[in-house]
């Protein structure tokens, strides 16, 4: 059975088809949630929200975009909703779980977490753009479709991110 048939059957209420669809895409959902949040427990929460939202939203999928593109949008929305709910609960600790200084993370993990936090500070969509293009391997056009912006906007964001990271690396190498 091809993906379109599987989606159509799941939209019609076929629980087995929905389960197969979820099995096919769960790794993608979790991987993006983990890369976005950088903490397993948070990624599990986001993935769970995404699976629930998928169940409630699948009927609205109209095959106008690739299913994976539509699914990335859904996961990003869930991640942003999760972040807002965390901010309401605790303004001081955006990401529950391991802190930067608790010793449980490698230097690479700490560096990546710091970079992702800096990307959030650059403005809306920067973190998601970097993750979609560099971590998920989407083209600028595909990332633009997921985020609802033009390909040129994605290219500009990637340029801005690279420029910022170049300045960051210069500061790090100078010991600032």
What do these predicted ranges mean?
Residues 9-20, 30-49, 151, 174-176:
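Short, charged helix-capping/linker segments at alpha-helix termini
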Residues 11-12, 35-38, 48-66, 85-87:
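Sigma70-family region 2
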Residues 12-15, 87, 99-131, 136-146:
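Amphipathic alpha-helical segment used for protein-protein interaction
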Residues 22-40, 57, 119, 168-171:
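Amphipathic, Lys/Arg- and hydrophobic-enriched alpha-helical face
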Residues 31, 45-52, 65-77:
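Structural recognition of an alpha-helix C-terminal capping motif at a helix-to-coil junction
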Residues 56-63, 73-93, 108, 160:
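Arg/Lys-rich amphipathic alpha helix in sigma70-family domain 2
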Residues 76, 80, 126, 135, ...:
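DNA-recognition helix of helix-turn-helix
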């Amino acid at each position: 059975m091809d993906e379109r048939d599987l989606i159509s059957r799941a939209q019609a209420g076929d629980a087995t088809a929905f389960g197969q669809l979820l099995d096919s895409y769960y790794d993608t959902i979790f991987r993006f949630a983990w890369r976005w949040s950088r903490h397993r427990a948070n990624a599990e929460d986001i993935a769970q929200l995404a699976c629930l939202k998928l169940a409630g939203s699948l009927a609205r999928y109209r095959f106008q975009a690739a299913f994976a593109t539509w699914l990335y949008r859904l996961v990003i929305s869930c991640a942003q909703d999760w972040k807002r709910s965390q901010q309401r609960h605790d303004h001081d600790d955006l990401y529950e779980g391991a802190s930067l200084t608790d010793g449980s993370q490698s230097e690479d993990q700490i560096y990546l977490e710091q970079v992702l936090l800096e990307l959030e500070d650059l403005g809306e969509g920067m973190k998601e753009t970097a993750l979609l293009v560099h971590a998920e391997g989407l083209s600028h056009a595909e990332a633009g479709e997921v985020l609802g912006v033009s390909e040129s906007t994605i290219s500009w964001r990637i340029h801005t991110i690279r420029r910022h990271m170049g300045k960051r690396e210069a500061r790090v190498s100078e010991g600032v």
